[in-house]
Amino acid sequence: MSCYCGNTQPYSQCCEPIHLNPHSAQVPEQLMRARFSAHILKNVEFVIETYHPSCQASNERDAISESVHSHWLRLEIISTQMGATPNEGFVHFKAFLDQEGKVFCLEERSRFLKENNCWFYIDGEFPAAIKQGRNDPCACGSGKKYKKCCG
């Protein structure tokens, strides 16, 4: 079985080692994938632990728990890039979730910082919302037109 993050490797070789040692991610994309898998597995503690300490994520435990307990469907990595320094990296992704039978897409360009040889999520930017046309392919990935699927 492929990993929850959509990688073709099995979970035991992809995100599980990072879930067992949150600071073992070698690049921001690994941490991003592990954070998504943690949402699928309802692992609130992992998500909190992998926020940058300056975010004080433990103070937002309820909001993070609510997000983690959403019905996440799949992750699509659009691009990755390193920042201005070797201690900064970005992952542009789309994460799909089901809310009451409707599929929604969260698109973000996440920023990660490396401190003491550990990667942390610090913040992200959301691209301007794009209006989906009725005849466009549905964002859920079904291959159907939006109007015949989630529209």
UniProtKB/Swiss-Prot annotation:
Signal peptide: none
Family that this chain belongs to: Belongs to the UPF0225 family.
UniProt organism field: Vibrio cholerae serotype O1 (strain ATCC 39315 / El Tor Inaba N16961)
Protein name, UniProt field: UPF0225 protein VC_1852
